[in-house]
From Swiss-Prot:
GO terms for cellular component: cytosol. It comes from Helicobacter pylori (strain P12). This is Probable transcriptional regulatory protein HPP12_0160. Keywords: Cytoplasm, DNA-binding, Transcription, Transcription regulation. HAMAP family: Transcrip_reg_TACO1. GO terms for biological process: regulation of DNA-templated transcription. It comes from the Bacteria. It is found in: Cytoplasm. It holds the Pfam family TACO1_YebC_N.
Amino acid sequence: MGRAFEYRRAAKEKRWDKMSKVFPKLAKAITLAAKDGGSEPDTNAKLRTAILNAKAQNMPKDNIDAAIKRASSKEGNLSEITYEGKANFGVLIIMECMTDNPTRTIANLKSYFNKTQGASIVPNGSLEFMFNRKSVFECSKSEVKNLKLSLEDLEFALIDYGLEELEEVGDRIIIRGDYNSFKLLNEGFESLKLPILKAGLQRIATTPIELNDEQMELTEKLLDRIEDDDDVVALYTNIE
């Protein structure tokens, strides 16, 4: 998604009740990470990242601990599933989900698309080749300055760890690398002792499209329904 679209989405997110919307999604990511790689963050990079992202959203420690414990219970029976869909105006949508009931999840997603004229779920794999998967990290400019590093120094230091692109956005620095370089880039930040504000794997459209305000308003109705679903943990489109 392009910056203009992300700005509009960010404005909406500020209005969301984080306790009811964001925290359950973060908790699922923590539970699944602990289930896959163990409950010790020191030896589970995926869990470290999930906890880091939760702390960035001010998720209480008790909630984080509960999510880790849930991995060893029946409640921790989560699976990762990706679904794909199309909407009007050439919009492509990829939805990453974490669910304990795939039947419920796909039924809900189909209902959102069925309520939107011209939109439909498509077979998995239909759209994946139209998105590049990237490792994306965010850090604070002030933390970089505290380490007495220039942006050029930071870029040079992380190139050997898989950095492909460095971008300044406000008071933050965005680092992007290949999908397979996530673990290596994480090690690069750790070697510099540079705190990470947010990290994850994202899908970036190879051929973004632009929508006018009217088209965006109609499309956002569908995207809002999808994002409001507790099973959907990440949503990507080809909108510029």
